[in-house]
């Protein structure tokens, strides 16, 4: 069994050290194997300029947050997935780090940027990866990646048992969509969302929906947090459940795939719908006899 969970809270915009300290204070009090933190938990979400995003971004793995979380992970023998803005050369990325008892492991850069994120960040261009952390194999995705079912499918095909999903959800459909993603791939998912709202620089107010959750491979919501309260939740799961892809004795989720029919999924210029149809000739019916 594996003890997994999330920390849902309201990060203070621009207060990197305060946000990191709050996380360390809370995680220091629990016993867990894997904890997921929200997207951009160090910085907050609603940037008003690229310069502001650059100022709050950090290098990975040598930046402040990765170093502090690595110290915690070593002390607690803990794996952590945490979202933060990353600065790499002249590029900025909406990233998530994977940290373990031996320190920094890897980074995932968000593939599908949402709304004004496109003004500050570059989309991630690395392959979707799965990491073996001993008792489980995990993949990472960030927030709006949920809108694209291909992400979880690829991670699942690569053997992921658990999908770690840092998020700053503002759309209401994400939590329920993740239930479907888990069911259609037979994997666990841990969504770590934030609460509160941000309204900066005269921009539209963003209200974050909370509802962080852990979902099972059968689509069962094992736990869903509130919409507006800070919560640190840890529960036990058996990652081996995610390796049972049989739906029944005649159907296997992955073996039954018809990849010969799916070519359009990777075609940047999919075929247009058929517009011409062959009309059947009308046959004249004889008049009924009286």
Which residues make up each language-model segment?
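Cys-nucleophile CN-hydrolase/nitrilase-fold catalytic domain and related Cys-dependent amidase chemistry
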Residues: 24-105, 170-185
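Active-site neighborhood of phospho(di)ester-bond hydrolases with catalytic His/Asp-centered motifs
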Residues: 35-39, 80-84, 108, 141-142, ...
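CN hydrolase (nitrilase-like) catalytic-core segments centered on the catalytic cysteine
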Residues: 64-79, 147-233
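Short amphipathic alpha-helical segment that frequently serves as the phosphate-/nucleotide-binding helix
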Residues: 16-26
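Short polar catalytic/cofactor-binding loops
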Residues: 8-14
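Extreme N-terminal starter segment of soluble prokaryotic enzymes
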Residues: 1-6
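C-terminal beta-strand edge segments of enzyme domains
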Residues: 130-132, 194-290
